[in-house]
Amino acid sequence: MWAAIPARADPKGETSSVGFEIAWLLRQPDSALAILTRGPNVVYEPQSPGPIPAALLVGQAWAEKGDTIRARGSFDAARRTLEAQVRTDPTDADGWSWLGLSYAGLGRAPEAISAGRRATELLPTSRDAVEGSGVLMRLATIYVRSGDTSDAVAILRKLLASSSAGFVCSVQLLRIDPTWDRIRADPDFKTLLADPGTPSGTAP
């Protein structure tokens, strides 16, 4: 259904973004790619006021399919766009967090974490509980894709305890989102899903 929507009917990519998210959670990367291929080059997610290069999501879908070459090509295209974006506006928290995810997709962990942390400094949850939670969730994703399970779990715990973060982080979402597959065997992550109130570290 989503892939059948013509690009002209989705000029800002909002429908493409929602369709991608549904396909992602249903573990249907081929459907996700079909949706993005028909959509615009820049999309907008409901939880992010700023633009997102569709190439970043395309890279995510290719990585889920195990096609590392195509994934790297897409992540690198997103990187170039986002680096230009934060050069133009160094205070763009969303731009920094999406850039961090593109670095993580390229295996550039130190740069990914640095960019993700910069985003949380620019837009902490203390300043904007809703949009700041989205930025913080992306940092958790960067951590897990960079192999840092403990910091990822600490952030997830903080978000689960927040009344303003339910739209980006819930036990139900964590259970079905493929993003977290690589840490499902981790004892702290298992405990988090069973009892999100159990202490297990401090989020940055």
Describe each PLM feature range.
Residues M1-P204:
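Alpha-helical protein-protein interaction modules
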